[in-house]
């Protein structure tokens, strides 16, 4: 299984901390960037072939990780035009002819530690086209929202600064 990591966002909500000189996934936790921790979790789960979709400040990510060999990974990059971002799903369009098998898709600024093999087993057992892992949060007004019923996604609402609840 391969992994695709979306790392092209501007990180506007955290720009006071990043100073718009490093992308949000490069913020450090315990001495390493969030993105490093994600990649090491993928490696722990046997996933070493990773495509990173970069955009705003993507050069910082490329300079740090390179081709991934020093981390025991095989990293490739797809560059999204930072002036014309396509959004989370839109950026996957770049990969429509490149990845034909199941893959894990992660947002680069989310710090998670899950068993991807179990998630893939669930995906296959349910004959799913897409398996989506979500979590509740305390700030729905500035987050993407997924409306589900009985384990089936019914709607997706992109974050909007106009939403108050």
Task: Indicate residue ranges for each PLM-predicted region.
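N-terminal nucleotide-binding beta1-loop-alpha1 segment
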Residues: 1-20, 43
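Conserved N-terminal catalytic core of the sugar/cofactor nucleotidyltransferase
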Residues: 2-5, 32-111, 116-118
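Glycine-centered loop/turn positions within well-structured domains
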Residues: 12, 59, 154
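Short glycine/proline- and charge-enriched loop/turn segments
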Residues: 18-21, 75-77
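Short catalytic helix/loop segments, enriched in acidic residues and glycine
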Residues: 20-36
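Conserved beta-strand segments of alpha/beta enzyme cores
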Residues: 25, 74-76, 152
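Structural signal for conserved beta-strand scaffold positions within catalytic alpha/beta enzyme cores
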Residues: 28, 77-79, 132, 155
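Conserved core of the sugar-phosphate nucleotidyltransferase
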Residues: 113-165
